[in-house]
């Protein structure tokens, strides 16, 4: 293992404004077709730092953006056979790693976007999913927590079946 001291990053303190306007957005959906955002940035976290996106949010009077999940997720297993995909991010396979489809540049992309938004006076709220995973029910794929130790991470009934309080097949 290689251990490296992370770079010190100066972070702007968020400014709380009572009565603000929180705009919830799906990163991919919000930035994918904006004509002023360079094509290579569209659909990514990095696009949120583009002046056209920031100007649009400012024109709307947005005080904070709430980013729908940006951590790695998987499609529900019934979607691919139908030619469909999940773009919402609510089926996480990990809790803290960014989805490479949204942040191909990794954490640097998110840091840059947050710094640009903060610099424009716009706060950032991350929507995180901690109550279930995309591993689904007993028939789902073992990708992370289930493969490590299903009983330690997921709630199980006395008979060993996964408890499904979330409607997704499992409850953490």
Feature map (PLM): residue ranges:
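The feature marks proteins involved in alpha-glucan
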Residues: 1-26, 31-43
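Substrate-binding/active-site clefts of carbohydrate-active enzymes
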Residues: 28-172
């Amino acid at each position: 293992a290689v251990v490296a001291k992370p770079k010190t990053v100066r972070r702007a303190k968020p400014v709380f404004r009572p009565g603000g306007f929180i705009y919830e957005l799906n990163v991919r959906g919000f930035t994918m077709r904006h004509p002023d955002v360079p094509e290579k940035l569209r659909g990514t976290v990095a696009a949120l730092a583009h002046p056209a996106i920031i100007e649009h949010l400012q024109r709307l009077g947005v005080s904070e953006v709430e980013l729908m999940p940006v951590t790695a997720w998987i499609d529900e297993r019934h979607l691919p056979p139908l030619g469909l995909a999940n773009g919402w991010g609510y089926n996480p396979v990990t809790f803290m790693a960014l989805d490479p489809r949204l942040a191909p540049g990794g954490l640097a992309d998110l840091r840059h976007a947050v710094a640009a938004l903060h610099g424009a006076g716009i706060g950032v709220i991350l929507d995180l999913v901690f109550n279930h995973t995309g591993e689904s029910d007993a028939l789902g794929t073992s990708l992370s927590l289930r493969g490590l130790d299903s009983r330690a991470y997921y709630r199980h009934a006395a008979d060993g079946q996964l408890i499904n309080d979330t409607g997704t097949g499992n409850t953490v």
